[in-house]
């Protein structure tokens, strides 16, 4: 799970403190999801920290700046891997929110996560430095860079096969 959770009544300064703890150079910033008790309300990015003077960070809450959870790219955890690849490639960040069957946030998925799943399924283990480098750049590990193109060609091939069967 690579997202953080903050209660909606927390001051923006808390968001700033979370960001200082993130090791962005290693894997990119975590998403910050906002809740009120057991209810998911949305998410917040760093824009309020850039737009507001530091003096306002203790007066405004993260809940004042939340965005709807539905605005994050997402995929259900039961989706086949090819759908996850399409969702990741369609997202601006190269990452999607994974939703449980109940529609609740369960984690995130990026290119490296997909690459690890494919390699594991194939029984291939790459050295840790190679995996770390791919994670740092949010890229597929070597040998899997063609996954998006392969997945993109799948619907075209299946549609063409359907047309050929219909014409015979």
Placement of each model-derived feature along the sequence:
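Bateman (tandem CBS) regulatory domains
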Residues: 1-17, 58-73, 130-133
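The conserved cystathionine-beta-synthase
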Residues: 5-29, 34-36, 53, 73-101, ...
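Intracellular, membrane-proximal regulatory regions of polytopic membrane proteins
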Residues: 11, 33-35, 44-50, 57, ...
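C-terminal structural cap/anchor segments
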Residues: 16, 30-31, 40, 45, ...
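Short hydrophobic beta-strand motif reused across regulatory alpha/beta modules
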Residues: 41-49, 106-115
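Soluble N-terminal domains of membrane-associated systems
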Residues: 46-51, 63, 125, 166-168
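Solvent-exposed, non-transmembrane regulatory segments of membrane-associated proteins
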Residues: 126-148
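Short, low-complexity N-terminal regulatory "tails/caps" that precede and couple sensory modules
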Residues: 151, 161, 165-168
């Amino acid at each position: 799970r690579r997202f953080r959770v903050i209660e909606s009544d927390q001051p923006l300064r808390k968001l700033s403190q979370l960001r200082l703890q993130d090791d962005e150079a290693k894997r990119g910033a975590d998403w910050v999801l906002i809740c009120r008790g057991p209810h998911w309300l949305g998410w917040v990015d760093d824009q309020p920290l850039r737009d507001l003077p530091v003096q306002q960070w203790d007066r405004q809450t993260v809940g004042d700046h939340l965005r709807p959870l539905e605005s994050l790219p997402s995929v259900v955890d039961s989706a086949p891997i090819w759908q996850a690849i399409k969702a990741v490639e369609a997202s601006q960040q190269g990452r999607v929110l994974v939703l449980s069957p109940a529609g609740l946030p369960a984690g995130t998925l990026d290119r490296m996560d997909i690459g690890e799943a494919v390699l594991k399924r194939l029984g291939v283990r790459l050295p840790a430095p190679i995996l770390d480098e791919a994670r740092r750049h949010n890229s597929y590990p070597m040998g899997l860079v063609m996954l998006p193109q392969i997945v993109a060609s799948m619907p075209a091939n299946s549609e063409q096969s359907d047309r050929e069967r219909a014409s015979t």
